Amino acid sequence: MLAVYQTRFLEAALAADALKFGEFTLKSGRHSPYFFNAAAFCNGKLLSVMTEAYAAVIAELHETCAIDVLFGPAYKGIPLVAGIAQALFHRYDINLAWAFNRKETKTHGEGGNIVGASVAGKKVLLVDDVLTAGTAVRQSLALLAQEQAMPVGLVIALDRQEKVGDSNLSALKQFSVENQLQTRAIITLDDLMTFVKESGKPAVLEKMQAYRKIYGISEAD
């Protein structure tokens, strides 16, 4: 059964065309029966729904994992961390700092690679929309190491739960294992399939089941 924030998130994603069902060719070359584009959450109402969903996940994680700063990789992570920080404070009375990186180092003014809160010596939670190759997130980890920060985890919007290479690990699980970090997602492929089933879309569900049989991890993590 989906949580209320998950249902609201998926309903908003459908309404915004952030979530589409059909035939899509991914960057990996795989032919997927669904497509997710977080950039379509591009107005105040949609951003609010998305950041409140992130906040729900992070508030639960915060109960067992100390977090000082939310970090959003530029550019997509910038509005996310700002909105999530607000949602955490208003909904859960959790007051976290937030920061993001510059794409290019600034040599004048305040300078540096980081904008926002200082991350030095802080427990930092990374936030991004999806994790595929993970290039931006890994670059962020390298930058945070230079800044003497202490990364504690990563939260994304969608975990596709697809195998990476010859392993039976998803991209998110592989990232967790490689970096010894906590990882969470608002929605997993399992959650999405539950939503599709409850929405009365048997044809779509059948295609998703077939897709997962080929590319999905054996068990949900």
From Swiss-Prot:
One Pfam match: Pribosyltran
Cofactor entry: Mg(2+)
EC number: 2.4.2.10
Binding-site residues for 5-phospho-alpha-D-ribose 1-diphosphate, renumbered to this chain: 27, 75-76, 102-103, 106, 108, 128-136
Keywords: Glycosyltransferase, Magnesium, Pyrimidine biosynthesis, Transferase
The keyword Transferase is assigned to this record: yes
Gene3D superfamilies documented for this protein: 3.40.50.2020
Gene Ontology molecular function: any one: magnesium ion binding
Pathway(s) annotated for this protein in UniProt: Pyrimidine metabolism; UMP biosynthesis via de novo pathway; UMP from orotate: step 1/2
Biological process annotations from GO: 'de novo' pyrimidine nucleobase biosynthetic process; 'de novo' UMP biosynthetic process; pyrimidine ribonucleoside biosynthetic process
InterPro entries: OPRT, Or_phspho_trans_dom, PRibTrfase_dom, PRTase-like
Top-level lineage group: Bacteria
Catalytic activity: orotidine 5'-phosphate + diphosphate = orotate + 5-phospho-alpha-D-ribose 1-diphosphate
UniProt keyword Nucleotide-binding present: no
Binding site for orotate: 35-36, 132, 160
GO CC field: cytoplasm
Subunit structure: Homodimer.
Family note: Belongs to the purine/pyrimidine phosphoribosyltransferase family. PyrE subfamily.
Function per UniProt: Catalyzes the transfer of a ribosyl phosphate group from 5-phosphoribose 1-diphosphate to orotate, leading to the formation of orotidine monophosphate (OMP).
Protein name, per record: Orotate phosphoribosyltransferase
Species per Swiss-Prot/TrEMBL record: Dichelobacter nodosus (strain VCS1703A)
